[in-house]
From Swiss-Prot:
Record keywords: Cell cycle, Cell division, GTP-binding, Magnesium, Metal-binding, Nucleotide-binding, Septation
Family affiliation: Belongs to the TRAFAC class TrmE-Era-EngA-EngB-Septin-like GTPase superfamily. EngB GTPase family.
Listed GO biological process terms: division septum assembly
Gene for this chain: engB
Keyword Plastid in record: no
Annotated protein name in UniProt: Probable GTP-binding protein EngB
Length: 194
């Protein structure tokens, strides 16, 4: 798959405001500061498409990006960010849960896991939630450029242990683009097979 066009559509804080569910949605989920925005920019080749920040908690809404005029990339707020109020954390959690439970257009959930700190409690909870709701998902091990080959192989094995039902596990580096072609191939397959 080649991405030839990508544009920001809108940010949403309510399920009722989301676009009509007519195009497939590829959803990106993960802990705060795991690299979701960097991955989206890397996949599309557009550095400023998704706003990045070294400060966790930058994404606070559900962000929609129209890709090739055919499907959406959906950037969810990061989970596990401790520096927000309990009420804000609960609101984000409810928004994410409702979206994943109810949104018919979801083709695939791409769960980003920091390869340097793989499968923390929040990551495992997300995978269990997706499995409970029968959502197809794949795992992207981010920041893999910071690992040597032995550590990358270990991450792959750990991922398969925690997520036996994952459609794929990809080591990815937004810095070098390693894993990009493989991830785009998996995304393409999920859209075609929907």
């Amino acid at each position: 798959m080649n991405i030839t066009s990508a544009s920001f559509v809108a940010s949403y804080t309510s399920l009722h405001a989301l676009p009509e569910a007519v195009l497939p949605e590829i959803v990106f989920a993960g802990r705060s500061n795991v690299g979701k925005s960097s991955l989206l920019n890397s996949l599309t080749g557009l550095k400023g498409l998704a706003k990045t920040s070294a400060k966790p908690g930058k994404t606070r809404q559900i962000n929609y990006f129209l890709i090739n005029e055919l499907f959406y990339f959906v950037d969810l707020p990061g989970y596990g960010y401790a520096a927000v109020s309990q009420s804000e954390k609960a609101a984000w959690g409810q928004l994410l849960a409702n979206y994943i439970e109810r949104r018919d257009a979801i083709s695939l959930v791409v769960v980003l896991v920091d390869s340097r700190h793989p499968f923390m409690e929040n990551d495992v909870a997300m995978l269990e939630f997706l499995e409970f709701h029968g959502r197809p998902y794949g795992i992207v091990m981010t920041k893999s450029d910071k690992l040597n080959q032995s550590e990358k192989s270990k991450c792959q094995r750990v991922a398969k242990t925690y997520a036996a039902k994952a459609k794929f596990v990809v080591n990815y580096s937004s810095f070098s683009g390693a894993g990009k072609a493989l991830l785009l191939s998996h995304i393409d397959h999920s859209i075609i097979s929907q």
